Amino acid sequence: MAEIEKLRGKTLLVTGATGLIGSAFVDMLLRANDLDVTVYAAGRNEERARRRFPEYKDDERFHFLKYDVTEPLDCDVCFDYIIHAASNASPNFFANNPVEVMLANINGVKNLLDYGRAHDMQRFLYVSSGEVYGEGDGRVFTEDYYGYVDINSPRSCYPSSKRAAETLCAAYGKEYGMDCVIARPSHTYGPYFTESDNRVYAQFIRNILRGEDIVMKSTGSQFRSWCYVDDCVSALLYILLEGKSGEAYNIADNTSNISIRELAEMIAEIGNRKVIMQLPDDAEKAGYNVVTKSVFSTAKLEALGWRVKEGDMKSKMKKTISRCS
């Protein structure tokens, strides 16, 4: 990946570094052949970081920074780039802790932008979400599209605060001249999710790894764009280095647009299990994303030169499951 050479000699902060996307981004940086780059991997749980990154414990390029994004960042490092990938994407958290979700998404961006502004940061990459689009009208989502979000629903804590955080990036760009770019990943899958992660793909994989049939709590008719995490982080690199300041870019694999039901059947087939239906309880319903169709255009991202890596979704899901087992 020739683009990564542009980071030679740079210092980067990656928040959410023990999460799915953040940790894969750290891997990409540190596994690049002899790349002279300094990476500060920020997260709240040092033990989780030790488990996730054992191969870097003696690597002088790697530093773990214990940090909660809801607080101002207190350190003396001048980061060339900040990649803000910290956000709780668990539907269970949306249902039970909507206040914390909103404050973390908005204040996290503010705290990091304030730090970057005070320390001559070169560029800020905000990892937002495709949930900013809300409920659409059936069209493919381009970056200038915005659908309906019920602002009086507590479940809207996530898309509404992601929208607000994006606007905050734009405001800092306008008022303070800061260089910000935004990524909007589609539903992203890959290994290294936690036992408490209740996103659908993680639930389905845990089912088959335990030798269980996959339990669906809905009809599974919701239609989604998906992206393998390695493809997602390669897209983040293009956005970081080639994206236009102030712009947002969708991330998705356009060969991986399937329904939740089709996803369940794919994972069940890989694990030689069945899919069974079960009614959800009220708490589970409260965390559901009500959007029925969420398909992304990636034309803007591809114009930067990015392409999805070879392999279909089933082969990448097999790789995910084998790395989880």
Kindly give the residue locations of the regions a language model identified.
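Conserved Rossmann-fold NAD(P)-dependent oxidoreductase catalytic core, especially the SDR/UDP-sugar
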Residues: 84, 103, 110-155
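Mid/C-terminal beta-alpha module of Rossmann-like enzyme folds, strongest
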Residues: 242-285
